[in-house]
Amino acid sequence: MYSSELEGKPVIGYVKRANKKLKQPKITYNRQLNRLIDNARTVYVTGDWHLWGMGKDGIIRKGKRFYSTIQELRKLRSDDFLIFLGDLVNDEFEDKDALRRILSEINCRTVMILGNNDVMDREFYEQYFDFVVEAFQWKDITFSHFPLPDFTEGFNIHGHIHESTTYWDYCPRNYNAFREDGSFFTLDEILNFFNKGYVNHYGKFIKRES
């Protein structure tokens, strides 16, 4: 059901496209988006699914969190809200039909933040996500794909980096929402851990060094 015509085939003569430069994203403030988050039963935060990608041998394969991500999507209810922090697949994957079958599992309102691997045309993503942005602000939180440094008020929830300890000094008010097992955070979980001084390191919570 979730197979792709590209799986198991070598990518011959493939020239990797340059990633989009989103390290300094345009930060969106959207009242409708913020109201949907305010009124949701549960707000989930996830990113870096990398559902398919090309290995070192040039073969397209499913990512290691492929099936756990689908299981998480099926738990969502219509009155939930999903914040996706970018990188649906690795950027060499171009099978839109296979990706459509995954995205059709989403049954709640959503926002997608474009990651460096999200290089398909924007109109494709807009078919499956209610909002598609480079970054956005909700209350005192900025959501982005790349971590944003130099926050003095509020904080930044981001993807891209799968561990946090390397970036304690660089991003002291940032929280990455990656989980190795593919499960989704709730926004309440993230706020609770951040306020207690913990960072997320591959899904394990470590007390931030002072």
Regions found by a protein language model. Give the residues of each.
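Conserved beta-sheet core of the metallophosphoesterase superfamily
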Residues: 118, 122-209
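Hydrophobic "anchor" residues on beta-strands that sit immediately upstream
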Residues: 44, 83, 111, 155-156
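N-terminal active-site segment of His-dependent metallophosphoesterases
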Residues: 1-97, 192, 196, 205-210
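Conserved beta-strand termini and adjacent loop/short-helix elements that scaffold enzyme active sites
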Residues: 46, 85, 113-115, 144-146, ...
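Short, flexible hinge/linker loops that cap or flank conserved catalytic cores
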Residues: 36-38, 104, 149-150
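A general structural motif
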Residues: 40, 78-80, 107-109, 152-153
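Metal-dependent catalytic neighborhoods of phosphoester/phosphodiester hydrolases
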Residues: 56-57, 86-104, 114, 119-132, ...
